[in-house]
A protein has these predicted regions:
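Aromatic-enriched hydrophobic runs in primary sequence
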Residues: 3, 62, 115-117, 209-214
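Intrinsically disordered, low-complexity acidic regions
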Residues: 123-225
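Compact, well-ordered interaction domains used in eukaryotic information-processing assemblies
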Residues: 22-148
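Plant-biased recognition of short, low-complexity, intrinsically disordered N-terminal tails
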Residues: 1-28, 37
């Protein structure tokens, strides 16, 4: 049997593989703070790319690169083997650039993703979660589509079965078929918070302009800034 080609593609075939990417963050408390931590650091966090149910993805993922905030030492971290994750401590949220490299025989370009490092609780029970110092889980589901894969990659993919998503999410199952609705709720909550912040800022500007106008009316000129 001839060796599968790493350039010739299997026409009319599409194969997907699900992954999740994101972070978990845990508050640093007096009880778990170590002496080597900077005093301003408030959380321990880990950003990762992994299988939906922690299954091995290295049969199609060759390398993962995480680009952190420039204030971190060696801000670009490259992992050539699982677990594809980076753990750090810090105090602020920022965007992490993630680049996923596929196996050479795939002939595919790297996939670039962005994840906003999330340290603080969100959602309807965020206040309770904050009071109880619960870990924050902020992951996103992504389906990687191999469109007309090379013969070699087709053999790799079909030799490793994709996981089947459970119908419903439970305490142990983070992603399931009903997760999309939960993601939509989360996005709606984030949009609501942004709109509330914009409205609060608008009201402050109106109040400031009103105060300046009243001062000008009383003194005949604007105060120096």
């Amino acid at each position: 049997m001839p060796t599968p080609s790493s350039t010739k593609r299997v026409k009319g075939v599409q194969i997907y593989r699900p992954i999740v990417y994101g972070n978990i963050a845990t508050p640093i408390t007096k009880e778990n703070r170590t002496s080597n931590l900077p005093p301003e650091h408030t959380h321990r966090w880990t950003v990762s790319v992994k299988g939906v149910y922690d299954e091995d993805i290295s049969y199609f993922v060759k390398r993962v690169q995480f680009k952190l905030h420039e204030t971190y030492t060696n801000a670009t971290r490259t992992l050539d083997a699982p677990p594809f994750e980076v753990s750090e401590t810090g105090w602020g949220e920022f965007d992490i650039h993630i680049k996923i490299f596929f196996r050479t025989e795939s002939g595919e370009k790297p996939l670039q993703l962005y994840h906003h490092l999330t340290l603080h609780p969100f959602g309807p029970d965020k206040e309770i979660a904050k009071e109880q110092n619960r870990p924050v889980h902020a992951y996103q589901y992504e389906e990687i589509l191999f469109n007309e894969p090379t013969e070699a990659m087709y053999e790799v993919l079909t030799s490793n079965k994709a996981p089947e998503l459970a119908p419903k999410r439970t305490g142990k199952i983070m992603y399931a078929q009903d997760t999309e609705g939960e993601e939509e709720d989360r996005l709606a909550e984030a949009i609501k918070q942004v709109q509330e912040l914009k409205e609060e800022t608008r009201k402050k500007l109106i109040d400031k302009e009103k105060a300046l106008a009243e001062m000008k009316a009383a003194t005949g000129k604007y105060p120096k800034s």
